[in-house]
Curated annotation (Swiss-Prot):
It is found in: Cytoplasm. Disulfide bonds: none annotated. The lineage of its organism: Bacteria, Pseudomonadati, Pseudomonadota, Betaproteobacteria, Nitrosomonadales. Its main location: cytoplasm. GO terms for cellular component: cytoplasm; Holliday junction helicase complex; Holliday junction resolvase complex. One of its GO terms (molecular function) is ATP binding. The gene is ruvA. This is Holliday junction branch migration complex subunit RuvA.
Length: 194
């Protein structure tokens, strides 16, 4: 399996890129979120990859972050979602937006993605609901969430009796580097205004 590519970016034409790794050019399909963060052609680039072998093709998908690749892998496990659909979802939604939609069980964001209908969106929400940790809806279960303070604030709000939707909305407004006590204080102030 090819897990990572490091080399010179030779071509980039959405959604494909070519990376020269010591004289060998690897063609990768990337989500638009990764594509927009790529350097100019001729510069060094590192992509985390997922190698997929099919009967008629061998395909390489590249990602700018481990979280994005992990989400792609989870999407592939959903019945009826292939690599093309998973890439379209990650091109249309950030990982955070997808996690938020799953946490709140909202099909609205998913059906805006080309190729994702109402039934597929509902299946995605059903099959992914246990795959995302409740830390503001931003991390996959089993990954190491960087926002433990947000998770603690969210858990505190839930323990105080706020529903998940209100608590998630309040936590999403907090700065990323906030302390837990300050986060709870600001969230309670925000929730008391509604």
């Amino acid at each position: 399996m090819i897990a990572r590519l490091s080399g010179i970016l030779v071509e980039k034409t959405p959604p494909q890129v070519v990376i020269d790794c010591h004289g060998v050019g690897y063609e990768c399909e990337v989500p638009m979120s990764t594509f927009y963060n790529l350097p100019a052609t001729g510069e060094k680039v590192v992509l985390l990859t997922q190698f997929i072998v099919r009967e008629d093709a061998q395909l390489l998908y590249g990602f700018g972050s481990d979280q994005e690749r992990a989400t792609f892998r989870q999407l592939l496990k959903v019945n009826g979602v292939g690599a093309k659909s998973a890439l379209a979802i990650l091109s249309g939604l950030s990982v955070d937006d997808l996690a938020q939609a799953v946490a709140l069980q909202e099909t609205g964001l998913l059906i805006k993605v080309p190729g994702i209908g109402k039934k597929t969106a509902e299946r995605l929400l059903l099959e992914l609901k246990d795959k995302f940790a409740i830390d503001g809806g931003t991390a996959l279960a089993g990954s190491n969430p960087a926002k433990s303070a947000s998770s603690d604030v969210l858990n505190a709000l839930l323990a105080l009796g706020y529903n998940e939707r209100e608590a998630l909305a309040a936590v999403k407004q907090l700065p990323a580097d906030i302390a837990v006590a300050e986060g709870i204080k600001l969230s309670l102030k925000s929730l008391s205004k509604t």
